[in-house]
């Protein structure tokens, strides 16, 4: 008999082990990582001063958000907030061997209604379209409504192709 809990050994043996971890999206919330990656994750957690490995993974995802968006077309952070968030500063760390440098980069958080995406502020302006889309529309309308010559058609098509990329 376990005097601390008031349960005898036979009751302990009959109890079925339950997975105490929740499932998220039908998947177990625990993740498997290769043995070669685990020490790196543990070391990074310690060096960044986080209490859990989950905080480190969250930090990694936040800092990789622009690259994830570029690869998938959407971000990874979900939110219930329907408003566009104001500009924020997110910490960014550069890890190079044994040295970590801490920088703060301004970021813009954009909410698309069901997902929140984080972009560095520089990417919001550096990659903005340099062409007025009404000009492209006007070129298209004049070209394909029969109001343009053959040379105008070639010029408008070339302009459209180069400015919409």
Swiss-Prot record:
What is this protein's gene name?
A: TCP16
One GO MF term on file is:
transcription cis-regulatory region binding
- List localization entries: Nucleus
Entry keywords, A to Z? Developmental protein, DNA-binding, Nucleus, Transcription, Transcription regulation
Q: Does the keyword DNA-binding apply?
A: yes
Q: Name one Pfam family in it.
A: TCP
Outline the segment boundaries, as ranges, of region: Disordered: 1-21, 146-165
This chain belongs to the protein called Transcription factor TCP16
* Chain intervals with Basic residues compositional bias: 12-21
**InterPro entries in UniProt:** TF_TCP_subgr (IPR017887), Transcription_factor_TCP (IPR005333)
Give me the Gene Ontology terms describing cellular component.
nucleus
Q: Where is the composition biased (Low complexity)?
A: 148-165
Source organism of this protein record: Arabidopsis thaliana
Keyword tRNA processing attached? no
Q: Where is the TCP domain?
A: 17-71
Let me know which tissues express this protein, per UniProt.
Answer: Mostly in anther in young buds.
The record describes the protein's role as: Required during early processes in pollen development.
Q: Where is the composition biased (Polar residues)?
A: 1-11
């Amino acid at each position: 008999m376990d005097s601390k809990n008031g349960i005898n050994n036979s009751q302990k043996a009959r109890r079925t082990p339950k997975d105490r971890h929740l499932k998220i999206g039908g998947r177990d919330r625990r993740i498997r990582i290769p043995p070669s990656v685990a020490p790196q994750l543990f070391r990074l957690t310690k060096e960044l001063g986080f209490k859990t490995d989950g905080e480190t993974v969250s930090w990694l995802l936040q800092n990789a958000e622009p690259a994830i968006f570029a690869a998938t077309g959407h971000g990874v952070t979900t939110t219930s907030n329907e408003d566009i968030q104001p500009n924020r500063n997110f910490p960014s760390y550069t890890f190079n061997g044994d040295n970590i440098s801490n920088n703060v980069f301004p970021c813009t958080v954009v909410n698309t209604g069901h997902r929140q995406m984080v972009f560095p502020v520089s990417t919001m302006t550096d990659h903005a379209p340099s062409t007025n889309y009404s000009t492209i529309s006007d070129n298209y309308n004049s070209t394909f409504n029969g109001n343009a010559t053959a040379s105008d058609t070639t010029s408008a098509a070339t302009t459209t192709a180069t400015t919409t990329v």
